[in-house]
Swiss-Prot record:
It is found in: Membrane; Golgi apparatus membrane; Endomembrane system. The modification Phosphoserine is found at residue 54. Residues 66-82 have a biased composition (Basic and acidic residues). Keywords: Cell shape, Golgi apparatus, Immunity, Membrane, Phosphoprotein, Transmembrane, Transmembrane helix. It is a single-pass membrane protein. Its main location: membrane. PANTHER family: LEUKOCYTE-SPECIFIC TRANSCRIPT 1 PROTEIN. The chain crosses the membrane at residues 14-32. This is Leukocyte-specific transcript 1 protein.
Length: 93
C-alpha cells in the first residue's frame, strides 16, 4: 500500500507541476517582458549618466584640494597631459 502511494505521489507531484506550468509561463513571461521593457525608460528618465568631464567640475572642500570650479573663466585650464585618458594611454605596460 505504501508503494502505491509513493509511486502515485511522485507522479502526482510531477503531473501537478506540469499542469500548473502549462498555465503559469504565459503569465510570468508576460510580466517579465513588461518589466524588462520598462526598465530602460525608468533608468533613463530618473537618472543621468555621469561623465568624467562633469566630475571635474564638482565642488571640492578646501581641505581636499584646490577649488577648480571657475578655472575655465580664469584662464587657468589644466594641463591636458594630466587628463586621465591621456595618462592611461601613455602608461607603460
Amino acid at each position: 500500500m505504501i508503494h502505491v502511494y509513493t509511486s502515485t505521489g511522485a507522479w502526482g507531484w510531477a503531473g501537478s507541476c506540469c499542469w500548473l506550468w502549462s498555465f503559469c509561463p504565459p503569465a510570468c513571461i508576460g510580466c517579465i517582458e513588461e518589466h524588462l521593457l520598462s526598465w530602460p525608460q525608468v533608468q533613463g528618465s530618473s537618472e543621468q549618466e555621469i561623465h568624467y568631464a562633469s566630475l571635474q567640475r564638482l565642488p571640492v572642500s578646501s581641505s581636499e584640494g584646490p577649488d577648480l570650479r571657475d578655472r575655465d573663466k580664469r584662464g587657468t585650464k589644466e594641463d591636458p597631459r594630466a587628463d586621465y585618458a591621456c595618462i592611461a594611454e601613455n602608461k607603460p605596460t
